[in-house]
């Protein structure tokens, strides 16, 4: 085996006060080639350092899972699910990357970094009652409904579940101003259509 140093980067977007969109607390790294590897980094410093045999690998990185996900073969990783509970309890957005890595005999890795992307969409909203209807319409609360409980970040193109139990309604958030409210939420993709 050779020693490899692999850098991990995130989408460079401004962080909000509610959640640090670029925070990486832990990483599970899976490599599939002639030999399969799983590495868990419970705290992340750059670069990630590990030992593998030289070769070509399909790589899967899962950031902010909050735990060592254990070994998963190349088939099972396609169906890995992350739950909204993980994101809400850790205050960190799940992030993933899928790609290929080539490791030479000197431990040089191409590409030399993985770029993880958020598995949840940032929704910035503003809701305002028009003057024409203000006498008869007041804002009381905002609630997101029909939210997926889980997503499969590596199962691209799959249609969201049609099972009602796989969805939930978010908490109704009281509004202090009856005419206008704004906020930010992080939601998993819903491909129900």
Language-model regions: role of each:
Residues 113-120, 187-192:
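Conserved "repeat-terminator" motif of extracellular CCP/Sushi domains
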Residues 1-4, 121-123:
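Short structural boundary motif marking the start of a folded domain
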Residues 16, 111-112:
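Short, recurring structural edge motifs at helix starts
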Residues 36, 40-44, 67-111, 174:
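Structured interaction patches on ligand/partner-binding surfaces of diverse proteins
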Residues 49-51, 100-102, 113-115, 143:
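Generic structural detector for well-ordered beta-strands
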